[in-house]
Design a protein with these regions (language model features):
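A short SAM/SAH-binding and catalytic strip from SAM-dependent methyltransferases
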Residues: 110-125
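A short glycine-rich, Lys/Arg-flanked "PGG" loop and its adjoining helix->strand segment in the class I
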Residues: 128-140
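Conserved beta-strand signature within the Rossmann-like core of class I S-adenosyl-L-methionine
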Residues: 141-149
Length: 201
């Protein structure tokens, strides 16, 4: 069982969406992840939102002209995503078993994004497998972008993966670190409790 399901019980979609809607109404910028991804690949590029949740990032990217596919294991989150953007392709799948061909999806993405603490919330011991699956979905030269917390101040659960461990998973999957930032606004990484990492296949 994933740490996410242990945390939420798999019934979190509406609550999660409501929380972000409230933040948006308060004036908070809700599109940093999409803006960051858009700075890396041009409009029209194929983007996989791995752990897409309610679709906040993917819907924004689609509106910016990207060809997007969303994958998540949480049915309640996907229900919200499908309601908000029924025209977009949303798939329910475990990232540790993700096989694009089985879903009728070409494995030639220009960018795979895993926002929202995806890696710390995976089922224990599946991190390397998930990186391998996501790397395999990239075209040569494609980018894996992952942002996640590294300490309890930035996570709803105890930390479960360090940056060296994540980088080792990426290296094993044939990915090379390109850059690392402290925020989705591309602030330089300062060794703090949150990191956005960019690896290239």
């Amino acid at each position: 069982m994933s740490r996410w399901k242990e945390l939420t019980g798999g019934t979190s979609g509406q609550d999660y969406a409501a929380r972000f809607a409230a933040l948006a109404r308060s004036g908070k910028d809700m599109h940093g992840e999409a803006r960051f991804c858009a700075s890396l690949v041009p409009a029209g590029a194929r983007v996989l939102d791995a752990g897409c949740g309610t679709g906040r990032v993917m819907i924004r990217l689609a509106r910016l002209g990207y060809e997007c596919v969303g994958v998540d294991l949480d049915a309640s989150m996907l229900a919200v995503a499908r309601k908000q953007a029924p025209e977009l392709p949303w798939f329910q799948a475990d990232l540790a078993e993700f096989a694009p061909a089985a879903l009728g999806v070409a494995a030639d993405f220009d960018l795979v994004v895993a926002a929202g603490n995806i890696f710390p919330l995976l089922a224990a011991g599946t991190e390397a497998t998930v990186v391998e699956r996501l790397a395999a979905a990239l075209r040569p030269g494609g980018l894996l972008v992952a942002g996640f917390g590294l300490d309890e101040a930035h996570l709803p659960v105890p930390p479960s993966i360090t940056l060296p461990e994540y980088d080792d998973c990426c290296a094993t999957a044939g990915l090379t670190l390109v850059d690392r930032f402290a925020t989705w606004d591309a602030d330089p990484y300062d060794g703090g409790g949150y990191a956005v990492s960019v690896h290239r296949r």
